[in-house]
């Protein structure tokens, strides 16, 4: 493969530096709206759908897309876009199942849902798996950023008389420092508004690059004729080559990846949790899927198509042997003049940073919610005033962001030897998403799914997955659909099918044998030393899992060990656990949504349609989160005392930045005026003299 260095001019570097300084100042400015951990992680649950939709574009498109889809577009043509528009068939499950549940249950992280739905033990294992997933995702992001900027860097750099080789890892370290600065001090509000800006810029830059490329070639007709027929096909070949095939990509990206991105990507989930309501989140998701992703498919893939056309027309300009991961940079440098190339590269790196900063913020949220707080409770430290605790947690969140950034840099080492970012990302998704994907999906949509089933999915399913990774030619081969195994990177994509089947099969098997487990536990409790037996089984399972993990023994022995884990884990979970199906499913599954809404409000839901009213505001004494409107205004809104409302600055272009959620209190007699407390005014960032709109939520 032909690789490049020193692409670009000093003008391009000046443009990029100015761009990044502007972005960091922009993010730091909105960091002033971060007053507590709710703002740091969730943006205060205040934003409008259009702002979140555009912010999601920056995160989704920036999710390594420019580099990896341009690479596959250069190698395979229009079929590179097939993975970019395959989320739609899981969207209804997200819109009407998972999204309302995570909002109405008021969970702050995905593992917290596992505790409410199953048990604290399930939360513990979910935290481990999700942290691995998120840190791995950050590593992929840093890898992509490094590969994007490396072609622009010289091979060596001399500082203070000492020469340094510019390597991938050194580039990644510098990028990580820049990326971590404003996310550490800004939080989710800074990320959302920075991504809003970058979302517009990267869509424009990607489409502008396509226009420049077509103009460079001549016109669209010439471009179309230059592309080989195979490059014009919408789908890849069914089962070849091993590096890019339809069936492997379907299971890796279309199933495991799509559910993983929608259901377990904490960064994406936090964007939706920052919307002001479930309906606003649904609008954002629908617009993203129906309109933004098809446009984005062109934005992220066109550099590869242009590169292939130029390579066919004049191989001396773009060599057919150009490294696929560098094709975006190479094409942009050819078709764009100095300065414009710098702007396009700034958009690329900004898009990638959008993903990384979101993931760092999300992983810090998991750490605070599922490691820091439970650890404090476990150590039984004396609880202090909430405001003091919140300040400490905000400081801990910022320290966690720094530590997670450093860990993400280390994670790059696990992926840097793959031929392309696309294959590294595919392997990552196939390996780390299946256990959590299966657990979330079955937990949300199947009331019968038990703690024993989810724990066995996590432990037994992962044991079987590790065996598949160790012995792919034996265990994954029966599911490979005729794909030839690459011995260097065996079954990067189709392993997702094997892993999903193992986890799904274990979860379903244990759920259907729940009564058998209860019978075994009943018999076990008949022994005098039943507790010792229970602890002995736990010790045996730990030993067997470690043996599978370190590959101690033959395949037949390890497979027997994994099966024994699957059979014994549900017994000990049932023995030691206390599970009430009604308590642990009501309001926590898709079938009990009305109960979830009532719990969210704290009383019966009022769905009567009322008006949205415009109000002036006054500071008044009050309690808690209560605001007071006039009796006439409440009648117009068809609201009662105790209902929930959303107060927002009238200026719609702010997207909900200046807003609060509150509760209707007893009415007063001053029409057109709402009484709020000083703390509510600070939280809503309301400006003196500015009119507010009040909307009843439920």
What spans do the regions from the language model cover?
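Membrane-embedded helix-loop-helix hairpins and adjacent transmembrane boundary segments
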Residues: 1-605
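Generic "edge-of-domain/loop-turn" microfeature
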Residues: 35, 279-280, 634, 652-654, ...
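Short glycine-rich, polar/acidic loop-and-turn segments at beta strand-coil junctions
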Residues: 56-60, 70-71, 631-633, 649-651, ...
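Short, surface-exposed beta-strand/loop "edge" segments at domain boundaries and coil↔beta transitions
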Residues: 553, 652-657
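Short beta-strand-centered segments at strand-helix junctions
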Residues: 606-648, 659-696
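Short, charged beta-turn/beta-strand-edge "cap" motif at the junction between a beta-strand
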Residues: 650-654, 697-698
């Amino acid at each position: 493969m032909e690789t490049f260095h020193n692409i670009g001019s000093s003008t391009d570097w000046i443009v990029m530096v100015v761009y990044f300084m502007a972005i960091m100042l922009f993010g730091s400015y909105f960091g002033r709206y971060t007053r507590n951990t709710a703002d740091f992680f969730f943006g205060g649950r205040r934003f409008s759908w259009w702002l979140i939709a555009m912010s999601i574009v920056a995160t989704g498109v920036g999710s390594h897309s420019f580099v990896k889809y341009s690479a596959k577009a250069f190698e395979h043509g229009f079929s590179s876009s097939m993975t970019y528009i395959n989320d739609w068939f899981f969207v209804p499950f997200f819109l009407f199942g998972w999204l309302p549940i995570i909002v109405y249950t008021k969970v702050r992280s995905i593992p917290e849902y596992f505790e409410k739905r199953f048990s604290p033990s399930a939360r513990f294992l979910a935290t481990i798996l999700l942290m691995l997933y998120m840190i791995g995702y950050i590593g992929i992001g840093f890898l992509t950023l490094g590969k994007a900027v490396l072609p622009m860097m010289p091979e060596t750099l001399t500082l203070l008389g000492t020469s340094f080789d510019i390597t991938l890892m050194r580039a990644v370290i510098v990028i990580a420092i820049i990326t971590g600065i404003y996310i550490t001090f800004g939080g989710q509000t800074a990320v959302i508004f920075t991504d809003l800006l970058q979302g517009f810029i990267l869509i424009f830059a990607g489409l502008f690059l396509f226009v420049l490329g077509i103009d460079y070639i001549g016109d669209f007709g010439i471009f179309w004729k230059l592309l080989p027929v195979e490059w014009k096909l919408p789908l890849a070949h069914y089962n070849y080559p091993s590096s890019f095939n339809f069936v492997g990509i379907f299971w890796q990206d279309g199933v495991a990846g799509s559910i993983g991105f929608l259901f377990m990507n904490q960064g994406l989930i936090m964007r939706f949790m920052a919307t002001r309501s479930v309906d606003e989140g649904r609008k954002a998701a629908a617009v993203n899927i129906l309109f933004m992703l098809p446009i984005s498919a062109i934005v992220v893939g066109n550099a590869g198509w242009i590169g292939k056309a130029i390579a066919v027309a004049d191989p001396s300009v773009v060599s057919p042997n150009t490294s696929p991961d560098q094709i975006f940079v190479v094409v942009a440098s050819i078709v764009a003049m100095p300065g414009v190339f710098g702007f396009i590269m700034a958009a690329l790196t900004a898009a990638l940073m959008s993903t990384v900063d979101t993931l760092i913020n999300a992983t810090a949220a998991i750490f605070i919610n599922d490691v820091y707080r439970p650890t404090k409770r476990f150590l039984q430290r004396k609880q202090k005033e909430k405001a003091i605790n919140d300040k400490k947690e905000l400081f801990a969140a910022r320290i966690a962001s720094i530590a997670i950034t450093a860990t993400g840099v280390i994670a790059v080492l696990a992926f840097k030897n793959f031929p392309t970012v696309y294959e590294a990302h595919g392997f990552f998704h196939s390996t780390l998403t299946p256990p959590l994907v299966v657990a979330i999906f079955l937990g949300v949509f199947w009331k019968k799914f038990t703690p024993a089933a989810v724990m066995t999915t996590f432990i037994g399913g992962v044991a079987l997955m590790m065996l598949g990774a160790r012995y792919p030619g034996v265990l994954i081969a029966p599911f490979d659909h005729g794909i030839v195994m690459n011995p260097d990177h065996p079954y990067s994509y189709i392993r997702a099918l094997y892993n999903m089947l193992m986890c799904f099969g274990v979860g379903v098997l244990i759920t259907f044998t729940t009564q058998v487990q209860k019978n075994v536990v009943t018999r076990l409790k008949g022994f005098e030393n039943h507790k010792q037996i229970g602890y002995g089984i736990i010790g045996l399972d730990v030993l067997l899992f470690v043996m599978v993990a370190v590959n101690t023994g033959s395949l037949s022995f390890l497979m027997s060990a994994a099966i024994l884990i699957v059979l014994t884990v549900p017994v000990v979970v049932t023995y030691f656990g206390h599970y009430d199906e009604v308590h642990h499913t009501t309001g926590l599954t898709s079938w009990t949504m009305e109960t979830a809404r009532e719990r969210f409000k704290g009383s019966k839901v009022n769905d009567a349609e009322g008006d949205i009213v415009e109000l002036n505001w006054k500071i008044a004494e009050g309690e808690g989160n209560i605001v007071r409107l006039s009796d006439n205004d409440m009648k117009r809104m068809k609201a009662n005392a105790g209902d929930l409302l959303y107060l927002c600055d009238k200026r719609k272009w702010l997207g909900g930045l200046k807003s609060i959620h509150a509760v209707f209190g007893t009415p007063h007699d001053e029409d057109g005026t709402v009484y709020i407390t000083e703390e509510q005014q600070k939280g809503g960032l309301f400006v003196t003299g500015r009119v507010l709109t009040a909307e009843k939520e439920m």
